[in-house]
Amino acid sequence: TTADVLQSSADAEEGSSHDSQGSLRTGLYAVGSLSSSASAGEEDGLIQTDVTIVAVTVDETGVITDCVIDAVQAKANFDSQGQLLTDLTVPVPSKNELGADYGMGSISGIGKEWNEQAQALADYVVGKTADEVLGIAVDEATKPAEADLASSVTISIGGFQNAIAEAVDRAQPLGA
């Protein structure tokens, strides 16, 4: 979870002999999109908010030391009069929280769930800078083109590359 990377950062700084110049920095970035929403017509309308969340820790040289990637896909239906049909009091779990219940494993060419693929990408970027993350080769659908990453990640990663770079750029020393 995002809390795990923040705790990891605090633990690393606590055990570090670095001064404030050499301590880890923590970055968080979230971006949302409504592009999957649909107007009501003959059928009910859908408002769908997709939010990508990335948390990183980076060292004094800008190298990623830890990364967590998650996403929330919140959906609500409404009728042609604009009346909400969805119970808005029901919590919306993140894709990491859903795990196997998200249901990607059965349709993925590599049999991996979304959370497993996000973790594989997060692991892959550890040891890289923001520029190196942005330089990861992708195809026209922004899916990994590098063989070792493509063997564990089949989802589009272009948005994640940008979100990781933004999290690195926003990283601040939080202290421990």
Regions found by a protein language model. Give the residues of each.
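Active-site- and interface-proximal helix/loop "cap" or "latch" segments in soluble metabolic
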Residues: 1-176
